[in-house]
Amino acid sequence: MSKQPQQRYAEAIVNRKARHEFEIIETFVAGIQLAGSEVKSVRLGQASLNESFAIILRNEVWLENMQITPYKHNRMEVLEAKRSRKLLLHKKEIAKLQAKVSEKGLTLVPLKAFFTPHGLLKIELAIARGKKLYDKRETLKNRENQRHLDQLRKQYS
């Protein structure tokens, strides 16, 4: 009998816009409560963190607008793709987050979703402040200058 080819799973789902649009102040790692078919979809890379955010309601942290495409081989009920999902944190961590987010201009933004070596899905969550347009331009300008300097160093070394 021939050996079945191993299926490759997605490494991590990254929210690329988050680092561009927000100034990251502090990061946390949280578990996420999902249905079985949602975990299978995330393993296949059929998830997106774009435009997602987290809110704190009644001492619980909820992830909003995370897109998880329904698993195509699911025989059970089909879940909504952008439903609210509960994040799993300790009470002390939630209290700390709530105290920091209550400051003006701070929000909770997911940076990436990844699997631990034990197969658990975790969300890297950040306390962030929105950047102004001129901050974004300045960041792009600095990045471009650094890239140019690196090219010159490589050329003359």
Swiss-Prot record:
CDD domains: SmpB (cd09294)
PROSITE patterns: SSRP
Gene Ontology, cellular component aspect: cytosol
Listed GO MF terms: RNA binding
Principal place of residence: cytoplasm
Compartments, as annotated in UniProt: Cytoplasm
A Pfam family assignment: SmpB
Keywords of the record: Cytoplasm, RNA-binding
One Gene Ontology biological process: trans-translation
SUPFAM superfamilies in the cross-refs: Small protein B (SmpB)
The protein's role, per its UniProt record: Required for rescue of stalled ribosomes mediated by trans-translation. Binds to transfer-messenger RNA (tmRNA), required for stable association of tmRNA with ribosomes. tmRNA and SmpB together mimic tRNA shape, replacing the anticodon stem-loop with SmpB. tmRNA is encoded by the ssrA gene; the 2 termini fold to resemble tRNA(Ala) and it encodes a 'tag peptide', a short internal open reading frame. During trans-translation Ala-aminoacylated tmRNA acts like a tRNA, entering the A-site of stalled ribosomes, displacing the stalled mRNA.
Record NCBIfam families: PRK05422.1 (NF003843), smpB (TIGR00086)
Family indicated by similarity: Belongs to the SmpB family.
Protein's name according to its UniProt entry: SsrA-binding protein
